[in-house]
C-alpha cells in the first residue's frame, strides 16, 4: 500500500496555503457559553498558575515559548462557524459510522464523521481523544475539521466515560495495557480509510486527558500517528506530581499512581520516558493560568525533541487556564490546530462554509 507523501517539517510555511474567508452569511456573535462548556470553567480548581520547577523562571519560559497569533481570516471563519451554532452549517449532524476496533480480546468503538468530499477519496484523518463518550449529533468541534476536509474520529478507548466500568478500565496499574488501544485505533483507522492503496495521513489531538493520550500516542507508540497536537497536557507525570499540591496529588493517586509507591508505573505511562522514539511533528499548547500543567516539564520535553532534530513546538498562552471554552479561545486554538495539521500533511487549508448544512 502507498502512503500519502510526507512533508518536510522545515517547510510548514510553504504548504497548507490559506484559501478561505469569513463564512458567506453574517451571523450573530457566538454566545458566551458554547455547546458542551463546563459549568466550573472559572473555578479555582482549574484556574490559577501553571507549575514551574524550583529554579525555573516563569517569565523566561513564557519568553521562550510566546503566544503566536493564528491567521486572522481563519480565526474569523471559525468564529463564524461557532456563532452559527448549527443553524445552517451542520455537516457534523449527519449520521455517524460506528467502527468496531479490536485490540486482542478488547473491542471498542470509534465514532467517525466523514465530510461529503471524502466519501470516496483518500482524506487525512484526525483522531480526537477525550474522557467523554462519543455522541452523534451537531457539535462545533467536528464541524470545524469536517469543513476543512478532515475525517473526524473519536475512539472510545478504555478510560472514556461510556460506562462506569469502562471509565475505570485504565486506572492505576491498568493504564499501561489500556494505552495499547491508542495503537489499535490507529491501525483500524488506517485500514478503514485506505483508498485505492493510499494510506491516509493520521493525526492525533486532545485536551487535558486527551492531550496526555496524544503525547503517549506520539511517543510510546511512535509511528502510529503522523503528527500530534496536545493541549493542557502533562509530559512527565512523576515530575508533575512532585510539583503540584498535596490535594491534587492525592486526587490523582487512583488514576495515575502514588509518586513514591508507584514510581515505575508513573515512568511507564509518562510521555517523557518514550521521547526518544518520536518520529513525527508534535505541538503543545499550555495556558499560563492552568494549575494542572507544568511549564518546566513541557519545556524539557520540547527541548529534548529539538535536540534530536524533531519538529516540536510549545506555546504558552498567558490568558488561558485549564478549560478554554470562551468563543475567542476556541477560535484561537482551533485555528492553530488547522494550520498545524494542514501544513504537516501538505494539504491546502480551505474551510468550506458554502452549500447546505
Model-derived segments and their meaning:
Residues 187-194, 198-242:
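Primarily recognizes the serine-hydrolase "nucleophile elbow" in alpha/beta-hydrolase
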Residues 289-293:
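Acidic catalytic loop of the alpha/beta-hydrolase fold
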Residues 21-22:
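C-terminal motif of bacterial Sec signal peptides marking the signal peptidase cleavage site
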Residues 299, 306-357:
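C-terminal catalytic histidine-bearing segment of alpha/beta-hydrolase fold enzymes
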Residues 97, 119-194, 199-201, 207, ...:
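Cap/lid segment of the alpha/beta-hydrolase catalytic domain
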Residues 44-116, 137-147, 191:
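Non-catalytic accessory segments flanking enzyme active sites
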Residues 278, 284-286:
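Short beta-strand/loop motif that positions the catalytic acidic residue
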Residues 226-227, 233-274, 280:
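Mobile cap/lid helix-loop segments that gate and shape the active-site cleft of serine hydrolases
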